[in-house]
Amino acid sequence: MPMEKLCFLSLAVLLWGCSTFEEEVLPDQADSPRQLSVSAAEEPGPDPGSLEIMRRAVDSVAAHSGVRSRSASVSGAQIEPTHRYMRFSPATKAQFDALFDQDEFTCYNFPLDEVSPVSADEGFRMSGPSDTPEQLYAVLRTTVVLPDTIVSEVLKELYDPSVTERGVADPAWADRVWAEARALIDDGRHPGKIIPYIPSGEIKVWDNIAGDYIPIEGVMVTIMPPDNLLRVLTTRTDKDGKFRMSGSVQEPVNYALSWNTVYWTIKSSAVSSANLRGPSVQGAWNVKISGDDVISGPATVFRAAYRYWHKMPALGLTAPNLGRKVRITCHNSVGFTYYWNGKELSASGLFHPVVNSDADPDIEVACKRNASYVFGTVAHEIGHAAHYAFNPKFNGKTNALIKESWAQFTRYILTETEYKDLGLYGKLHKSRLFNPNQHLVAFQVPDYYNQQMWYLGLGAERDETVRLYTPMFVDLYDTFNQNKWYGYWSPGRTKDDLDRTPDDDICMLTIREIQEIAFGSKNKSEAIGWIRQYAARYGFTSEEIDRYWAVYSLIEDEDYDRYK
């Protein structure tokens, strides 16, 4: 079998790390339904698009055409492959990433022509995280130039009669060739009347806040008839997690999902993709990804990434633009280790402003957590990426207090909007009723998600870790005064702790303005200067701004690095 090789050049860059602080470890979610399946592969039938079948089909069309027609002048010996079905064997994570970063073809971590006898309600099959680079499969045009470092093998040569080097050939002739090719391989595999159907389905994932499966919007779904590799259809799920292809098919198809887009890639390890392989079925594919499944992490990472890139810009957030796809690795663990200044450290989330090479992830996330925690962690790290990408040189001069407080704001605002849009806001936060002057008033209880439990503690450990992960920018947006809560509505903090709890009556209306303040400030002195200007536009007095800022002004050593 002919062999070809592929190589992609790598870029050398430097490593720098920033990890999130875990203020609260959320409890493990309750058991949720689990779907697994393992099945043996079957041999596919003949492919009508294979070069051998197509040459016979072209000759047959010519033999049954008028002597003066164009169809009669084209012989099978004249046609050359337009596509190749290939297997890649990357040897390093740099080579593996290069295949996923390019946009000329789509790679899958399973053979595209393999028939799986799994029923639609048995779920999906995937390889799972790997320590060695996976083999990848793809169908690509013969015009794609492949450098020669990644080993690749041509598994099948294909011909599409509707494609020429100059554009589209005669569509009537192409249709005749396709029909003849199908007739040549019709060996009785489909006895009786074949009823066309439209591939469709829905994709959902378990969420701990909902206590149920919720839809995932924007996921790319691919269908591939295993015996017709040139007929690949793709679509994306809608807001209800549903998908429906635009064309009908007759034969069973292979379904697949990809968490990758033109903006990001999501992997389950440095050298294994997180894509899902579905069953070979003749009908719909309805997927429910359970919370204890290894793929629930990448699914939740996708939810957060999709919201940041596709929903939040309309509300004022700027999505990160690194000049290439953002690479996200989802670790199947509650935490992961990394090295910084010669020390082994642990984290649940990490953004690398400058990566070591084109093989390293930009963002790492520990995904064996509750969905809401993973979602917030991803939102935090993408917030770091957006902050850095907006102005890398300025960001390099910005201290940790501003960076982490901004990332806490993106964690907050993405979580708020996600669960509001899902109709689950009442489950995200608890409320408590009070009865002042015989009028019931409902107050949202401070919690992990609204970040209103934060205060500048006096203990050394809390002061060195928690203090930089503040709700400084959250307090500019929300309508909650945590000082009044702990001092009046629900007393319980000591006077010292209450004095170090923000007294916040500021409420600015736009996310864009808060981003402008954060991205335009290198330290707290610059931040309060901008805050005074912006808050004054809304009529807030100097006294109100001073009360809001009093606790934040007490933060010292605002660029403290506890890892040195």
Task: Put a short name on every predicted segment.
Residues 297-368:
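Auxiliary, metal-adjacent structural segments of Zn-dependent hydrolase domains
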Residues 16-17:
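C-terminal motif of bacterial Sec signal peptides marking the signal peptidase cleavage site
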Residues 225-242:
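Short, acidic Ser/Thr/Gly-rich low-complexity loop/linker segments typical of extracellular
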Residues 362-378, 396-398:
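Short pre-active-site segment immediately N-terminal to the catalytic Zn-binding motif
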Residues 376-392, 404-408, 412:
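Active-site recognition of the HExxH zinc-binding catalytic motif
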Residues 42, 51-82, 90-100, 453-564:
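Pan-zinc metallopeptidase signature
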